[in-house]
């Protein structure tokens, strides 16, 4: 059974696929969003034990989400090539939602790290810039600016997890799971596109092959016509050049080739006719030579 014969129409798999796109995966994404909110709350409040537990629970949700996406992917692989455009339209919204949720979750920790790095750099550059501001405007003071900067950092940046806390290790595990989930979502988005590109490529090759076969057939037909037309002429030319009875035999020989190329009953009948004419001509030739017995003499003897 070929690969195409194993495919089925989308309408047969649509209920199962929509169960994933409308219910199962959105439920997992909503659960993941709640974990993200709790993680941000516990990390901001430095409740490391609760943060560690939330990391573990979020990791379980991510694993469940990955499992459900793989199951949906198996269904997508069974869809017939004619329905790939509709399939892509069906799974794109949930694919984009999963990609966005994963990116936001990873960005939460990334922004915290980047903000801490920025804070260190700002502290190195803060004193000269504040001195210039005080000189020009006479309003902004160094102490007030430092307090404002620290206040903004505390509001927007999450505190770094101490490395001696279990939450630090559990976050690394969760981060790896989220990255794997991101790759899985990307692969799912490329699945339908790659299948469609493969089908388009095969169609292009088939069309090119059909064109080549058509052109080749036309060329063969032309060549056959030219050859069949040329052979009788060649026979006539050979017969005319050689002359006499031998030249006539040479012409018949070339004509016999043409009859063989014609094929079928016509070729067979023409060949028999040429054979009879050749036999009669041989008898005439042998009868004109006194030293050679004729075919009829041989039969009598």
Swiss-Prot record:
Residue intervals of the t-SNARE coiled-coil homology domain: 161-223
GO BP term, pick one: protein localization to phagophore assembly site
Residue positions where Phosphotyrosine is found in the record: 156
Keywords, ordered alphabetically: Acetylation, Autophagy, Coiled coil, Cytoplasm, Cytoplasmic vesicle, Endoplasmic reticulum, ER-Golgi transport, Lysosome, Membrane, Mitochondrion, Phosphoprotein, Transmembrane, Transmembrane helix, Transport
Lineage top rank: taxon: Eukaryota
Keyword Transmembrane: yes
Sequence intervals crossing the membrane: 228-248, 254-274
Sequence positions bearing N6-acetyllysine: 41
UniProt modified residues of type Phosphoserine: 288
A single cellular component GO annotation: mitochondrion
Placement of sequence motif Endoplasmic reticulum retention signal: 298-301
Membrane topology: Multi-pass membrane protein
Localization of this protein: Endoplasmic reticulum membrane; Smooth endoplasmic reticulum membrane; Endoplasmic reticulum-Golgi intermediate compartment membrane; Cytoplasmic vesicle, Autophagosome membrane
Coiled-coil spans in chain: 49-128
GO molecular function: protein kinase binding; protein phosphatase binding; SNAP receptor activity; SNARE binding
Residue numbers carrying N-acetylserine: 2
Lumenal side, ranges: 249-253
Cross-referenced PROSITE patterns: SYNTAXIN (PS00914), T_SNARE (PS50192)
Ranges where the record places region Necessary and sufficient for localization to autophagosome: 228-274
Family according to the record: Belongs to the syntaxin family.
Subunit structure: Forms a SNARE complex composed of VAMP8, SNAP29 and STX17 involved in fusion of autophagosome with lysosome. May interact with VTI1B. Probably interacts with BET1, SCFD1 and SEC22B. Interacts with PTPN2 and ABL1; involved in STX17 phosphorylation. Interacts with COPB1. Interacts with TMED9 and TMED10; the interaction is direct. Interacts with VAMP7. Interacts with RUBCNL/PACER; promoting targeting of RUBCNL/PACER to autophagosome. Interacts with VAMP8, SNAP29, VPS39 and VPS41; these interactions are increased in the absence of TMEM39A.
Function recorded in the entry: SNAREs, soluble N-ethylmaleimide-sensitive factor-attachment protein receptors, are essential proteins for fusion of cellular membranes. SNAREs localized on opposing membranes assemble to form a trans-SNARE complex, an extended, parallel four alpha-helical bundle that drives membrane fusion. STX17 is a SNARE of the autophagosome involved in autophagy through the direct control of autophagosome membrane fusion with the lysosome membrane.
The name this protein goes by in its record: Syntaxin-17
Organism of this sequence: Mus musculus
Lineage: Eukaryota, Metazoa, Chordata, Craniata, Vertebrata
């Amino acid at each position: 059974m070929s690969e195409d014969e194993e495919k089925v129409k989308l309408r047969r798999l649509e209920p199962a696929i929509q169960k994933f796109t409308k219910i199962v995966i959105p439920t997992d994404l909503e659960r993941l969003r709640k974990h993200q909110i709790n993680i941000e709350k516990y990390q901001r409040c430095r409740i490391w034990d609760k943060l560690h537990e939330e990391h573990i629970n979020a990791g379980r949700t991510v694993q469940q989400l990955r499992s459900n996406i793989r199951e949906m992917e198996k269904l997508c692989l069974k869809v017939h090539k004619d329905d790939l455009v509709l399939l892509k339209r069906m799974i794109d919204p949930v694919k984009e939602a999963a990609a966005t949720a994963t990116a936001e979750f990873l960005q939460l920790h990334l922004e915290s790290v980047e903000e801490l790095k920025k804070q260190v750099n700002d502290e190195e550059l803060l004193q000269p810039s504040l001195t210039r501001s005080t000189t020009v405007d006479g309003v902004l003071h160094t102490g007030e600016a430092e307090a404002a900067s620290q206040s903004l950092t505390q509001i927007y940046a999450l505190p770094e997890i101490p490395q001696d806390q279990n939450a630090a290790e559990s976050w690394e595990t969760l981060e790896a799971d989220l990255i794997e989930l991101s790759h899985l979502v990307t692969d799912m988005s490329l699945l339908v596109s790659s299948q469609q590109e493969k089908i388009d490529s095969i169609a292009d090759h088939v069309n090119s092959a059909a064109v080549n076969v058509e052109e080749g057939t036309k060329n063969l037909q032309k060549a056959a016509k030219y050859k069949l037309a040329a052979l009788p002429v060649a026979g006539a030319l050979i017969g005319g050049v050689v002359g006499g009875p031998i030249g006539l035999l040479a012409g018949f020989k070339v004509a016999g080739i043409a009859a063989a190329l014609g094929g079928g009953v016509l070729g067979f009948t023409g060949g028999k006719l040429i054979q009879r004419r050749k036999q009669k001509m041989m008898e005439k030739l042998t009868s004109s030579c006194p030293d050679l017995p004729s075919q009829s003499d041989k039969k009598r003897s």
